[in-house]
């Protein structure tokens, strides 16, 4: 997604060595990974459907496990090249009725953004399903949630400016159509049957498969919104430290940003229903990945994990082929029943990695995936929180030391209980709020040492932790008092 929108990277050997020479000896062409940044823009033009899933250069030999590892290793970059990629989703709704917007309305918004603000359209089977502009993209989630995948940026000031620019554009086009956008983690008012379905091939496959593997997968697809940050690593060891820190602290971020307390017009019993939903979506591809904390963990272990996550699809001839439940290992040797003789390309691997949904996800960067969607200030605060912790060596070491003796059972307990009790969740001799205070200070210190005057972006986090009141609890209090037990005012309260 966001940080992936970098220049295409040819395969890199796991040891950083002479991959090109070895590849030529094995009789293969050098194949770059095609990404958004590698394509030119034509003013007001259209580009192929996202993701770009078919390679122009045909493989002469099957991919090996080494190649799959090398794809991940190619994300390693020196600290001076680390960037911040922020993604967020939001619900579009009709201002007059509060109903979710349909695809026709979304198409009109996309066309309006393309015409007024010079975005290129992404088209699938004659339907506009997204937009691109430089290294930014706008895409549609299954229920029409609008997602901005931001460009890889150097500072949080740039990140927040990007978010503000996007929200200005969306508001300018949407207001003329009587459409608003809501920053919350779960659809507060409407039932699953009220949510429109987007015309994207991969989502049809997922929609049919989800009920077979969990009870809440369709809710995840159609009624949730998140904000996440994508961050870089310099080496395998740096990736491991950040992955472990991110997983251990993900429930703390879930508590701080908890913002999904309503469902179908009433409180739902959770502070972050969105987070809870992931616990019964598809446990083959989600969760806290305890193996990341094993001494043997590294790129190879993640590849082994990903190879065993059941597939969703293969994309060939501009069509999605349903491969749900099939093995990428079988695909590697040309034995997919739905695509006999077909062998995977690096793009197939790239696509497969996007169908894995743990609390922290590894691609050629790490994605922090634990936070609910929220209003614009929190869209700036979430990346600030993680940048201060993971991009500063001293703070990262402090987090590693703090969490090194946490057990798998403790991490799972936090994952399970935080969506219900948030900052009030007991942990050891205190509460998650106590942990959050300590972690916030480490994040502030990390941002101070970066030297870009970015600490102010943590004000929202500071306010939540110092008060002990999560965003969800604040909404619940409004619901019981000022809103007189109606969720309708939340559409104005959290309007972008």
From Swiss-Prot:
The entry's keywords: ATP-binding, Chloroplast, Disulfide bond, Glutathione biosynthesis, Ligase, Nucleotide-binding, Plastid, Transit peptide
N-terminal signal peptide: none
Chief location: plastid
Matches recorded under Gene3D superfamilies: 3.30.590.20
Transit peptide as recorded in UniProt: 1-34
Record field: catalytic activity: L-cysteine + L-glutamate + ATP = gamma-L-glutamyl-L-cysteine + ADP + phosphate + H(+)
Disulfide bonds: 160-380
Similarity remark: Belongs to the carboxylate-amine ligase family. Glutamate--cysteine ligase type 2 subfamily.
Gene field: GSH1-2
Subunit (UniProt): Homodimer or monomer when oxidized or reduced, respectively.
Protein name: Glutamate--cysteine ligase B, chloroplastic
Region: Disordered, residue numbers: 14-53
GO CC terms of this entry: chloroplast
Enzyme's top EC category: ligase
């Amino acid at each position: 997604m966001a940080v992936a929108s970098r220049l295409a990277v040819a395969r890199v050997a796991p040891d950083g060595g002479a991959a090109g020479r070895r590849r030529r000896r094995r009789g293969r062409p050098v194949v770059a990974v095609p990404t958004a940044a590698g394509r030119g823009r034509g003013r007001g033009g259209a580009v192929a459907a996202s993701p770009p899933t078919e390679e122009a250069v045909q493989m002469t030999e099957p991919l090996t496990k080494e190649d799959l590892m090398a794809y991940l290793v190619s994300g390693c970059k020196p600290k001076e090249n680390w960037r911040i990629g922020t993604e967020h989703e939001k619900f579009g709704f009709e201002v007059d009725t509060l109903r979710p917007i349909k695809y026709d309305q979304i198409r009109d918004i996309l066309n309006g953004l393309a015409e007024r603000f010079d975005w290129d359209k992404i088209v699938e089977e004659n339907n506009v399903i997204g937009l691109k502009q430089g290294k930014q993209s706008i895409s549609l989630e299954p229920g029409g949630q609008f997602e901005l995948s931001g460009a890889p940026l150097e500072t949080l000031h740039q990140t927040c400016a990007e978010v503000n620019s996007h929200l200005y554009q969306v508001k300018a086009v949407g207001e003329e159509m009587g459409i608003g956008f809501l920053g919350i983690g779960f659809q507060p008012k409407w039932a699953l049957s009220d949510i429109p379905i987007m015309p994207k091939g991969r989502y049809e496959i997922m929609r049919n498969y989800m009920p077979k593997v969990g009870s809440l997968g369709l809710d995840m697809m159609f009624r949730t919104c998140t904000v996440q940050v994508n961050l870089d690593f310099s080496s395998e060891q740096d990736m491991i430290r950040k992955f472990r820190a991110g997983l251990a602290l993900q429930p703390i971020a879930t508590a701080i940003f908890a913002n999904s307390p309503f469902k179908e017009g009433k409180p739902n019993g959770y502070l972050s229903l969105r987070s809870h939903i992931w616990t019964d979506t598809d446990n083959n591809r989600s969760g806290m990945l305890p193996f990341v904390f094993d001494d043997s963990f590294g790129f190879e272990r993640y590849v082994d994990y990903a190879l065993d996550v059941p597939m969703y699809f293969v994309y060939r001839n501009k069509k999605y082929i349903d491969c749900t439940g099939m093995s990428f290992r079988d695909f590697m040797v040309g034995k997919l029943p739905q695509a006999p003789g077909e062998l995977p390309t690096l793009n197939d691997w790239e696509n497969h990695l996007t169908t894995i949904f743990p609390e922290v996800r590894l691609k050629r960067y790490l994605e922090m995936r634990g936070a609910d969607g929220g209003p614009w200030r929190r869209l700036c605060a979430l990346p600030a929180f993680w940048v201060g912790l993971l991009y500063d060596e001293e703070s990262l070491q402090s987090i590693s030391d703090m969490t090194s003796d946490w057990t798998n059972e403790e991490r799972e307990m936090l994952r399970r209980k935080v969506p219900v009790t948030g900052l009030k969740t007991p942990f050891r001799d205190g509460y998650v709020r106590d942990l959050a205070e300590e972690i916030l200070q480490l994040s502030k210190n990390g941002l101070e040492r970066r030297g870009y005057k970015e600490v102010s972006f943590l004000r929202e986090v500071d306010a939540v932790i110092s008060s002990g009141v999560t965003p969800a609890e604040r909404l619940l209090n409004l619901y019981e008092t000022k809103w007189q037990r109606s969720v309708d005012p939340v559409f104005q309260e959290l309007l972008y």
